[in-house]
């Protein structure tokens, strides 16, 4: 994982150095730090009364000081980041699915109910899409965009700008690993057109606006509002629109905005194929942007494989439910889940040639290179 604002460690160090209350707690040895799941589980258990302070590997791997092979905190990484464990309490790392590790709810009508599953949101979406076996991948199109590719029981260390992470770690099984590619701006680019350019009143209207024109009219929009994440990792890139002419209409910019996420997804998938040595056969999708048929068809065209959209798209919540259910015997094996949520699936198939896809991608790559350095 490259040093960036993405992992937790930089935020922890900044807080210690810049926030007096955090610094004071650190000096006293009373500071506790973990990812948001650890805080939620701690609070749901009643806070200091029970003091259940735990996290699972899919979340802890994002701190940047967990060893993804041992699934425990790495002393060398802790030393590198100057993290003194005598002054900072870190959550215990436990299985993603466990009948006792996460405690019980301390209040509300569900008081006494066990918490039996915990996953990072993208790992939960992969599980919810039933990406249990190597070679399966999902892409969540939300405010940002997150693509996870299951690589199996051994981590694949990326050399092409991706994150090597823990997908999930269920009891009775070996942990499963994934390659992840993150796009900083996806659905938020539609919000930008709505709020800043006033192109639309509601975000779902973006597809209709984009379909007012046949293509992007030569417009390319690199939506690098805060730099570019995987596989580029260009911190000083900024949002840039190329190819505007007197002919350009709002629909062209709307279409180019939707295409930006699709181009970045293709770049990530290309990197995943290089890292894993295997070509993906299909892509499962979820998240708000996947409701746009135009966007999903564009995605299929660019990556040259089928894009599968389930009818029930709350796959992140479903994945969390699977983790919890496995711990208490709702399902005995993952095989029991393979046919769940398959009815009503929409499949988008490529409609352009590989050559046309490559031509479009070449233009996008050129635009990415030209948007470097604008924050300096």
Predicted segments with their positions:
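A polyampholytic, Gly/Pro-enriched intrinsically disordered region
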Residues: 1-3, 112-118, 136-138, 326-340
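Gly/Ser/Thr-rich active-site cleft segment
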Residues: 1-122, 178-179, 186, 190, ...
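Generic hydrophobic alpha-helical segments
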Residues: 12, 126, 265-269
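Glycine/Thr-rich phosphate-binding loops that ligate phosphate moieties of nucleotide
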Residues: 21-24, 34, 47-51, 149-376
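ATP-dependent carbohydrate kinase catalytic cores
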Residues: 58-174, 184-188, 201-216, 282, ...
